[in-house]
Curated annotation (Swiss-Prot):
Disulfide bonds: none
Subunit structure: Interacts with PLRG1, CDC5L and PRPF19.
Subcellular location: Nucleus
Annotated consequence of substituting H208A: Abolishes exoribonuclease activity. Does not rescue the molecular phenotype caused by USB1 depletion. Does not restore U6 snRNA processing when expressed in deleted mpn1 yeast cells
HAMAP family: USB1
Protein name: U6 snRNA phosphodiesterase 1
The EC number(s) this enzyme carries: 4.6.1.-
Role this protein plays: 3'-5' RNA exonuclease that trims the 3' end of oligo(U) and oligo(A) tracts of the pre-U6 small nuclear RNA (snRNA) molecule, leading to the formation of a mature U6 snRNA 3' end-terminated with a 2',3'-cyclic phosphate. Participates in the U6 snRNA 3' end processing that prevents U6 snRNA degradation. In addition also removes uridines from the 3' end of U6atac snRNA and possibly the vault RNA VTRNA1-1.
Length: 265
């Protein structure tokens, strides 16, 4: 069974709360009516120069060999930045201990499974922003997050997911308490998406924390007996009830190689 699709991102990039001062909104013209911009001759910039500035509006490279053979759900184009809104999860040692038991067991069914490098719960689909939209988009998000309080949630139900194209499969822990708070967050994120004419989140989403992934559709191998055994491991793990109860303190937006944090009250 396919549940809410998830788009994975690498952990590359650095925390960056600063941006340039461009305030252009989607749909704004590049010059005022009645003004005719003077034509300018533009010469191509050598690759050796472009490579010196990875944070420019050209966006990150699209090289599938750098992220395990994953294929983009949309083609990379110059000036387009893949953008994703989510709740980050900082994995503690005990959580990684649980994963050290779960993953090898799942790999007996699907050997190509690999552990996620970073952990999060998605609040949006992956969308494309033009470079000059990033700052206004983040400002709009921050404005809508200011009224939200921190909350606890529990994610202890093992579930199998695929992305929309069925090109990747994920093992995740589904949220079993705190679902209403996540829906409230998504509602506000969706409002921002609508302001920028971007795709909103899925109807009836299954909020979850992805643990491992593989290329291809591996639901047949992972659902059924394997899923039952993985759930038994979680249920029997020492202090699992406490371990899988998580305090949500912030929402984060990743756009290209830039990260923006929005603390909750």
């Amino acid at each position: 069974m396919s549940a809410a699709p998830l788009v994975g991102y690498s952990s590359s990039g650095s925390e960056d709360e600063s941006e340039d001062g461009m305030r252009t909104r989607p749909g704004d013209g590049s010059h005022r009516r009645g003004q005719s911009p003077l034509p300018r001759q533009r010469f191509p910039v050598p690759d050796s120069v472009l490579n010196m500035f990875p944070g420019t509006e050209e966006g990150p490279e699209d090289d599938s060999t750098k992220h395990g053979g994953r294929v983009r759900t949309f083609p990379h184009e110059r000036g387009n930045w893949a953008t994703h809104v989510y709740v980050p999860y900082e994995a503690k040692e005990e959580f990684l201990d649980l994963l050290d038991v779960l993953l090898p067991h799942a790999q007996t069914y699907v050997p190509r499974l690999v552990r996620m490098k970073v952990f999060h719960l998605s609040l949006s689909q992956s969308v494309v922003l033009r470079h000059h939209w990033i700052l206004p988009f983040v400002q709009a998000l921050k404005a809508r997050m200011t009224s939200f309080h921190r909350f606890f949630f529990t994610a202890n139900q093992v579930k199998i997911y695929t992305n929309q194209e069925k090109t990747r499969t994920f093992i995740g822990l589904e949220v079993t308490s705190g679902h209403a708070q996540f829906l409230d967050l998504v509602s506000e994120v969706d409002r921002v998406m609508e302001e920028f004419n971007l795709t909103t989140f899925y109807q009836d989403p299954s909020f979850h924390l992805s643990l491992a992934w593989c290329v291809g559709d591996a639901r047949l191998q992972l659902e059924g007996q394997c899923l039952q055994e993985l759930q038994a491991i979680v249920d029997g793990f020492e202090d699992a009830e406490v371990l899988l109860r998580v305090h949500t303190e912030q929402v984060r937006c990743k756009s290209g190689n830039k990260f923006f944090s929005m603390p909750l009250k």
